[in-house]
Amino acid sequence: MDYLLMIFSLLFVACQGAPETAVLGAELSAVGENGGEKPTPSPPWRLRRSKRCSCSSLMDKECVYFCHLDIIWVNTPEHVVPYGLGSPRSKRALENLLPTKATDRENRCQCASQKDKKCWNFCQAGKELRAEDIMEKDWNNHKKGKDCSKLGKKCIYQQLVRGRKIRRSSEEHLRQTRSETMRNSVKSSFHDPKLKGKPSRERYVTHNRAHW
């Protein structure tokens, strides 16, 4: 009697474990067919961040901070990467730009929208700073010239003439840069719809018949 109970219990346990072993065998066979490779994870979704403007040089930290707002610096094992600088500009953003000229390449940066007056003023101010730096460098190079104390009056006269020419050309270049900056700011203000004035309506003067 005891043997019969033991046999029935073993058969009952074997019947319950058969489906589980079948499922486990199917999973092992699928893993064997794939060669034991793990499924490749999908690439992470990259965030795109709109830029206010594009700097002519990424070494200009002030321009980078102004143009690329809320930059997150991601520390990777290889190098430190500025997040958001490499996103390409859309075609619709390029359509808002003014037609570029050869002189625009000297700007500190290029705004993404012509309606952003603060951005235009910031980018155009870089030309004035660059002109002042050129003027100061030329004047310092002139001061570092040869010593004319032992060469006579002719050398001193030549240095004076050269210094006046350098100063005159530098001041003229600075004046042209400032006038161009003002012209571009006026152009950007004309493109701003808020600053455009409404067309003036003609006012007709009506005379009172009592004064005729």
Swiss-Prot record:
Pfam families assigned: Endothelin (PF00322)
Tissue expr: Expressed in lung, placental stem villi vessels and in cultured placental vascular smooth muscle cells.
Residue ranges with Basic and acidic residues bias: 168-181, 189-205
Recorded GO CC terms: basal part of cell; cytoplasm; extracellular region; extracellular space; rough endoplasmic reticulum lumen; transport vesicle; Weibel-Palade body
Chain intervals for the UniProt region annotation (Endothelin-like): 109-123
Keywords: Cleavage on pair of basic residues, Disease variant, Disulfide bond, Secreted, Signal, Vasoactive, Vasoconstrictor
Propeptide, residue positions: 18-50, 74-212
Disulfide bonds: 53-67, 55-63
Residues at the site labelled Cleavage: 73-74
GO molecular function, one term: cytokine activity
Disease linkage: Question mark ears, isolated: An auricular abnormality characterized by a cleft between the lobule and the lower part of the helix, sometimes accompanied by a prominent or deficient upper part of the helix, shallow skin dimple on the posterior surface of the ear, or transposition of the ear lobe/antitragus.
Family membership: Belongs to the endothelin/sarafotoxin family.
Role noted for this protein: Endothelins are endothelium-derived vasoconstrictor peptides. Probable ligand for G-protein coupled receptors EDNRA and EDNRB which activates PTK2B, BCAR1, BCAR3 and, GTPases RAP1 and RHOA cascade in glomerular mesangial cells. Also binds the DEAR/FBXW7-AS1 receptor. Promotes mesenteric arterial wall remodeling via activation of ROCK signaling and subsequent colocalization of NFATC3 with F-actin filaments. NFATC3 then translocates to the nucleus where it subsequently promotes the transcription of the smooth muscle hypertrophy and differentiation marker ACTA2.
Protein name listed in UniProt: Endothelin-1
Protein source organism: Homo sapiens
Taxonomic path: Eukaryota, Metazoa, Chordata, Craniata, Vertebrata
Encoding gene, per UniProt annotation: EDN1
